[in-house]
């Protein structure tokens, strides 16, 4: 029976088609239409490949099977790749509110149930506009359109699916860490916790487990002040379980993890309750051991009242307040909206995408990266980097208002707001999802995020192209045994130069002393504070402090076969193409209060560090014997190593990340963690020291019997690792060669999505295709690659640099405050302050935190 009343559009703008044909159109696609489950992420605010939204001119298309969203330019790509034909098209129409009798009324919302969770444009005054939301189903490839809501005419399953999509919450709210942080229970021991009056005071640094030498994953027992290491399986970090043993011996229930204490709280664990807990009296319990966690929490932003006025000038100078700054528009002048303490990410990404190598690697390869992206591009690093880079560089989201367009819009009574600035919400959600700090809404250290990003770029490099190579350099470390005078030269990889602040070299010491006396007097008499006097530090003094020898704690002398005093000096074994300099402004006082050196350093526009070039072993120097220190593995770790061979897929990635951030090759870090049985980064580090001279040190982990991602495909026997034919068929149906599909699946443990990533990241495959076919056909082949291990990739050159960008921080610590970025483009400085991009009039180069230099060609 023909349904009555419903009509839908026919492509080409022709007539209408009767509703009775709705069922016939949807029947072939019914198996692909899903109702979102509780764990599904439904994207209806933002395209997976661009920053298009329902506010965009073309609206947004939500796939009714994957619930991914696509702008008009990208929906066809998803249709071709997946064959999914049914999409929900979402469009928001905005009009300026008619003034008069209705003036001052609340904005008019039509179809109010459609976009309950749609983000509003913060730049628009909602009192001035009304909007109408439109939703319809679109069937590809013929673009049949069915208006929604259409309860009477659509099949029940389709109606339920549409309602579920329209009422779903944002996927970012689902993964907001505050959701689970608030669910941590209050410990039943917190109110009446017994604390021993034993005189223990905990220093702000230099901690070590009281029962072993571990210096990471340390926990402070809140009863007796013991500092002991945690268990490796608690939070995926290394430890020998001495904190748990102490609880079993003494029964003291609560411990706090050192290194997580902030004015907002800390990680507290209850051994008795066997899980994370909250302690409402944590400040008092920490104060018992000399830790004043609330010392910086006098105001909402975490600053003491006395800290506010002295810092006002810093905020004004860095943001160039009081100066009328000219807004900048167009390619390369797009801002990033602040998601709430996300300015550290925005500043780093603006600097990163001002570098041509990153522009070419991602935006330059956009069609290829997007075409070969995995089925869920929101969970792919390269796709999201490309999306962000295109958003920043295309100019598509940074357009100046044009008078003629404004007049035309007024005549049509429809407002088409220009989108200035993009929201990095999808990018931040992905790059921070495995990091406990970056995934929070708290302020973070821009330097730490920079290293985290470099690590992700390294792990997800596109074939042989790795844009982070421009930052990589080799550091030569010379360690001298003070007792025998013998030396050892080693090299390590680094990505930035950390420059100490030479406070003792201040050129205005008399002014500083006078200011400090006046400040204390004003505080004592509750008078206004004097105008801030900032220490002026010569850059040359900081450079000299970097070159000075450092004492080495716990140095093991191979000449003495025992621990001894040692001194270390560092030099550049190679100079990077781009030099990142971090000014070490942040520290902790003895009272545990985070402090920032409020200094002015005369950073040069032209930098010459050629004199810091490493020279290697000098005549007359005698090398320390090449003897490694003994590896000490705890007894419980030995038992676990003897009795259990872990699966390569279970490798503790957090320990791998810790080691990789020290500069060791990623595959070497994976092997170190694997062969030490997931016993923590400390033990794995010792393994690296022992094995780093071996020829296969940096080669991928290859375990007989496993075909994981780390295993070399050339080390497998032909039929031992044959992938299922149905998965091979899926890949070949996408246009890839069969032998290409087989090799990709063998290299990724038969994981379909990872295999597609592998194919895209190995463009050199075709050159070796004949060899792969021969290997596949020969079931008894056992060919092992004899390629030499690849050393660190560095781009050495001269030590002459010019400044092109710097990131500045305002506030007293990395846990609070604000970041902005200045970049020199087209001969002039530009300030990037979240979504605001303006020409800089007075760039505060002396107050920066991170500086980006590019090498001057010799």
UniProtKB/Swiss-Prot annotation:
Specifically inhibited by spautin-1 (specific and potent autophagy inhibitor-1), a derivative of MBCQ that binds to USP13 and inhibits deubiquitinase activity. Regulated by PIK3C3/VPS34-containing complexes. The weak deubiquitinase activity in vitro suggests the existence of some mechanism that activates the enzyme. It is an enzyme of class 3 (hydrolase). Residues 650-691, 722-762 form the UBA domain. Zn(2+) binds at residues 209, 212, 229, 242. The modification Phosphoserine is found at residue 112. A zinc finger (UBP-type) spans 185-293. Disruption phenotype: Deficient mice are more resistant than wild-type littermates to lethal HSV-1 infection. In addition, USP13 deficiency impairs autophagy in lungs of aged mice. Residues 334-856 form the USP domain. InterPro entries: Papain-like_cys_pep_sf (IPR038765), Peptidase_C19_UCH (IPR001394), Ub_carboxyl-term_hydrolase (IPR050185), UBA (IPR015940), UBA-like_sf (IPR009060), Ubiquitinyl_hydrolase (IPR016652), UBP13_Znf-UBP_var (IPR041432), USP_CS (IPR018200). It catalyses: Thiol-dependent hydrolysis of ester, thioester, amide, peptide and isopeptide bonds formed by the C-terminal Gly of ubiquitin (a 76-residue protein attached to proteins as an intracellular targeting signal). Its EC number is 3.4.19.12. There is a cross-link at residues 309, 403 (Glycyl lysine isopeptide (Lys-Gly) (interchain with G-Cter in SUMO2)). GO terms for biological process: autophagy; cell population proliferation; maintenance of unfolded protein; positive regulation of ERAD pathway; protein K29-linked deubiquitination; protein K6-linked deubiquitination; protein K63-linked deubiquitination; protein stabilization. One of its GO terms (cellular component) is cytoplasm. Keywords: Autophagy, Cytoplasm, Hydrolase, Isopeptide bond, Metal-binding, Phosphoprotein, Protease, Repeat, Thiol protease, Ubl conjugation, Ubl conjugation pathway, Zinc, Zinc-finger. It is found in: Cytoplasm. Pfam families: UBA_7, UCH, zf-UBP, zf-UBP_var. The active site is at residues 343, 818. Deubiquitinase that mediates deubiquitination of target proteins such as BECN1, MITF, SKP2 and USP10 and is involved in various processes such as autophagy, endoplasmic reticulum-associated degradation (ERAD), cell cycle progression or DNA damage response. Component of a regulatory loop that controls autophagy and p53/TP53 levels: mediates deubiquitination of BECN1, a key regulator of autophagy, leading to stabilize the PIK3C3/VPS34-containing complexes. Alternatively, forms with NEDD4 a deubiquitination complex, which subsequently stabilizes VPS34 to promote autophagy. The UBP-type zinc finger has lost its ability to bind ubiquitin and USP13 is not activated by unanchored ubiquitin. The UBA domains mediate binding to ubiquitin. Belongs to the peptidase C19 family. Interacts with UFD1. Interacts (via UBA domains) with SIAH2 (when ubiquitinated). Interacts with BAG6; the interaction is direct and may mediate UBL4A deubiquitination. Interacts (via UBA 2 domain) with AMFR; the interaction is direct. Interacts with UBL4A; may be indirect via BAG6. Interacts with NEDD4. This is Ubiquitin carboxyl-terminal hydrolase 13. It comes from Mus musculus. The gene is Usp13.
């Amino acid at each position: 029976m023909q349904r009555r009343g419903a009509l839908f559009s026919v492509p080409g703008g022709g007539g209408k088609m009767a509703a009775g044909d709705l069922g016939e159109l949807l029947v072939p696609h019914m198996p692909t239409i899903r109702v979102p489950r509780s764990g599904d992420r439904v994207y209806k605010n933002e395209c997976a490949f661009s920053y298009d939204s329902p506010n965009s001119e073309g609206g947004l298309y939500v796939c009714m099977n994957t619930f991914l969203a696509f702008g008009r330019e990208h929906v066809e790509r998803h249709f071709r790749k997946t064959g999914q034909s049914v999409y929900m098209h979402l469009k928001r129409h905005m009009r300026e509110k008619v003034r008069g009798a209705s003036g001052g009324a609340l904005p008019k919302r039509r179809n109010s149930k459609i976009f309950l969770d749609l983000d509003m444009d913060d730049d628009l005054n909602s009192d001035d506009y009304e909007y109408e939301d439109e939703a319809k189903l679109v069937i590809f490839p013929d673009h049949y359109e069915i208006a929604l809501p259409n309860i009477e005419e659509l099949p029940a399953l389709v109606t339920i699916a549409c309602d579920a999509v329209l009422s779903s919450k944002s996927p970012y709210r689902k993964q907001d860490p505050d959701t689970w942080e608030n669910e941590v229970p209050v410990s039943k021991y917190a109110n009446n916790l017994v604390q021993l009056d034993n005189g223990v005071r905990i220093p702000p640094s230099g901690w070590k487990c009281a029962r072993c030498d571990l210096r990471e994953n340390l926990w402070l027992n809140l009863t007796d002040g013991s500092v002991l290491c945690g268990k490796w399986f608690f939070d995926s970090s290394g430890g020998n379980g001495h904190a748990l043993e102490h609880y079993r011996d003494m029964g003291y229930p609560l411990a706090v993890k050192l290194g997580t204490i902030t004015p907002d709280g800390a990680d507290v664990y209850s051994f008795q309750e066997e899980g994370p807990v909250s302690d409402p009296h944590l400040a008092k319990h920490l104060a018992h051991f000399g830790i004043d966690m609330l010392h910086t929490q006098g105001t909402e932003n975490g600053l003491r009242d006395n800290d506010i006025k002295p810092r006002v000038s810093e905020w004004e100078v860095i943001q160039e307040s009081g100066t009328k700054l000219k807004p900048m528009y167009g390619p390369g002048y797009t801002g990033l909206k602040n998601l709430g303490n996300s300015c550290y990410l925005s500043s780093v990404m603006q600097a990163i995408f001002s570098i041509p190598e990153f522009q070419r690697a991602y935006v330059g390869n956009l069609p290829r990266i997007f075409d070969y992206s995995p089925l869920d591009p929101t969970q792919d690093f390269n796709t999201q980097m490309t999306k962000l880079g295109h958003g920043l560089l295309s100019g598509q989201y940074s357009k100046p208002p044009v008078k003629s367009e404004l007049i035309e819009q007024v005549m049509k009574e429809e407002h088409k707001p220009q989108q200035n600035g993009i929201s990095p919400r999808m990018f931040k959600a992905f790059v921070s999802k495995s990091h406990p700090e970056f995934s929070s809404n708290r302020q973070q250290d821009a330097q730490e995020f920079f290293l985290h990003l470099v690590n992700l770029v390294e792990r997800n490099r596109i074939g042989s192209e790795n844009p982070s190579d421009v930052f990589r350099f080799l550091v030569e470390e010379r360690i001298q045994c003070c007792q025998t005078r013998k030396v050892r030269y080693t090299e390590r990889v680094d990505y930035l130069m950390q420059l100490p602040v030479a406070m003792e070299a201040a050129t205005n010491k008399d002014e500083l002393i006078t200011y400090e006396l006046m400040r204390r007097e004003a505080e004592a008499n509750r008078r206004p504070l004097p105008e801030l006097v900032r220490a002026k530090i010569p850059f040359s003094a900081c450079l000299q402090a970097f070159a000075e020898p450092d004492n080495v704690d716990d140095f093991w002398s191979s000449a003495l076969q025992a621990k001894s005093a040692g001194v270390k000096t560092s030099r550049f074994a190679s100079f990077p193409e781009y030099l990142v300099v971090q000014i070490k402004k942040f520290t902790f006082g003895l009272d545990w209060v985070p402090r920032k050196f409020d200094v002015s350093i005369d950073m040069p526009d032209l930098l010459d560090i050629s004199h810091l070039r490493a020279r290697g072993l000098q005549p007359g120097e005698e090398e320390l014997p090449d003897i490694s220190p003994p590896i000490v593995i705890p007894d419980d770790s030995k038992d676990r190593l003897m009795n259990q061979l872990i699966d390569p897929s279970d490798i503790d990635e957090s320990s791998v990340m810790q080691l990789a951030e020290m500069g060791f090759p990623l595959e070497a870090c994976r092997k170190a963690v694997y062969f030490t049985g997931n016993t923590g980064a400390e033990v794995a580090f010792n393994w690296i020291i022992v094995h780093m001279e071996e020829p296969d040190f940096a080669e991928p982990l290859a375990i007989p019997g496993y075909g994981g991602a780390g295993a070399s495909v050339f080390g497998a026997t032909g039929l031992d690792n044959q992938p299922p034919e149905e998965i091979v068929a899926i890949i070949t149906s996408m246009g890839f060669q069969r032998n290409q599909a087989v090799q990709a699946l063998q290299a990724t443990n038969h994981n379909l999505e990872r295999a597609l990533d592998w194919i895209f990241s190995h463009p050199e495959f075709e050159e070796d295709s004949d060899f792969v076919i021969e290997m596949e056909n020969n079931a008894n082949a056992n060919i092992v690659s004899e390629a030499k291990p690849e050393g660190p990739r560095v781009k050495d050159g001269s030590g002459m640099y010019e400044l092109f960008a710097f990131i500045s921080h305002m506030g007293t610590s990395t846990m609070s405050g604000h970041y902005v970025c200045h970049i020199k483009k087209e001969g002039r400085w530009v300030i990037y302050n979240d979504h605001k991009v303006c020409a800089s009039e007075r760039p505060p180069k002396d107050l920066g935190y991170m500086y980006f230099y590019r090498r001057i060609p010799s």
